[in-house]
């Protein structure tokens, strides 16, 4: 629908693709790794029909946005979000971050505050801190797990994405929560992303510590998570985010995998719309 310039690389503009639909209070939907704004297909119509202005955008390196070599750290990604909000002059925004996108929500608020932001939603999101190390033994992703992800992307990215999307939409033995054409569609979206961006984002979402950012969140916050999320398990992420933010609310979706906004759109949308109306 439109693009904005957020920087340059070798004199070439770095552009973010975004779509802006509906009228009313703005809701900005931030997609997960390694997909695009298309992953909100089941949310955009529901929000627009309920009277909201809905903005989706493709993170740099993904979807229809530019694919620069660098800039996949959360400080840069939060700045990209900041530039989009400024460009559209959005006020009283609800930021909804899914998976990796929850990191942008946290880092944006931690860096830029809440002058433009009214509410925050973390959906299957990576904060507070996934990395497992000697300094943070309660994490879930250790160096070996992260290396496995990175090697998968470097050695055969398409084969990795094929397996990853199977786990993404599966809850335990339930692998029929989305159709095979839908899974393959999402694999194709991921396949079109920047290989370098796909790789660099692994280190960003697995090793970035958002605990300091969450400590600065003083606005109404909702955590939506699937209780069967094998990609970003609730107990290591959403549960801790919920506990870290005063008066946060939580909607734990029974049988929900990581990609619960697609597998359980009714439950996801009901939780989101109820929170928006509070």
Where are these regions (language model features)?
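Short beta-strand/loop motif that positions the catalytic acidic residue
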Residues: 217, 223-225, 229
């Amino acid at each position: 629908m439109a693009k904005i310039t957020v920087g340059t690389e070798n004199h070439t503009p770095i552009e973010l693709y975004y779509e802006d639909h509906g009228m009313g209070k703005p809701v900005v939907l931030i997609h997960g790794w390694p997909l695009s704004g298309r992953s909100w297909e089941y949310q955009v119509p529901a929000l627009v029909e309920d009277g909201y202005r809905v903005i989706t955008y493709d993170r740099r390196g993904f979807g229809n946005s530019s694919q620069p070599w660098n800039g996949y750290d959360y400080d840069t990604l939060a700045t990209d979000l900041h530039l989009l909000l400024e460009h559209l002059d959005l006020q009283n925004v609800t930021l909804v971050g899914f998976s990796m996108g929850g990191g942008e929500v946290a880092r944006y608020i931690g860096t830029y505050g809440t002058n433009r932001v009214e509410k925050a939603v973390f959906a299957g999101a990576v904060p507070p801190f996934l990395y497992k190390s000697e300094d943070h033994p309660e994490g879930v992703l250790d160096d070996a797990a992260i290396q496995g992800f990175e090697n998968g992307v470097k050695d055969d990215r398409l084969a990795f994405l094929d397996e990853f999307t199977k786990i993404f939409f599966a809850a335990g033995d339930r692998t029929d929560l989305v159709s095979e054409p839908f899974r393959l569609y999402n694999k194709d979206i991921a396949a079109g992303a920047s290989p370098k961006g796909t790789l660099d984002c692994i280190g960003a979402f697995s090793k970035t510590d958002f605990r300091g950012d969450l400590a600065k969140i003083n606005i109404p916050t909702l955590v939506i998570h699937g209780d069967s999320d094998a990609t970003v398990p609730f107990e290591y992420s959403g549960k801790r985010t919920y506990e870290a933010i005063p008066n946060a609310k939580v909607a734990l979706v029974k049988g929900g995998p990581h990609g619960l906004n697609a597998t359980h759109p009714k439950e996801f949308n009901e939780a989101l719309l109820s929170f928006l109306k509070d």
